[in-house]
């Protein structure tokens, strides 16, 4: 019996140690009540909320009673560009201290930059990071393609307003990236639109339909939006780079590439829906602040 204990008990202890040592360290540190990245990727859970936030960041829009998007809309449109071109009139002149009267204060320009660039970046980056970890996951790359199109929609306004922005190094992890010239930004955007359209043309089913506030996951419409943006940008650069313009105009109008937006049924827009109840951001300034009117 003594010999049995001497031989068997140490063997059992060694076996237990080997079993414990062979445990996957990742499993040990994984919460039993949380979810893994793999589980988040199933059904697009990893991207859903970020995609909805990203789409809403291009033109600020929120739920009824939420004042944040209304305040942002004032800075972006109502008392700035929209006021200047005559789309809106205002009951408050803010001491003539707004862009509508050619007064560009540092404070307001900082807010504008944050809205046009920063808010888009905050929602795009999580999608970019998550999809970069799943390069072999077709759905992840399709979602990233959709996100990159939205990013271009948002950042196109940023570069048109401020010129140099960080684009080619965005999402690279570089904490001190050098802003790109507008020429490089446009080239990068055109390349991203072409790549995104190519990925989404191959989609055989809807992409993130539960969280897509624009097209409900219809990949063919996203392709048309990408090509339409490509066409718009290519026409803009015609006098600066005729060869680049010619190349991308041809690509955008090539029917085999998915076409462009030609009917209102294909226009990109976000509205109130069962998916996410929303209210027009201008209503805050019109009804609650009583500061803005049309024309």
Predicted feature locations:
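Bacterial N-terminal signal peptides that target proteins for export
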Residues: 2-10
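Core hydrophobic alpha-helical transmembrane segments of single-pass membrane proteins
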Residues: 13-14
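Membrane-proximal, proline-rich intrinsically disordered regions
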Residues: 23-86, 133-134
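Structured, solvent-exposed acidic/aromatic patches
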Residues: 41-45, 90-295
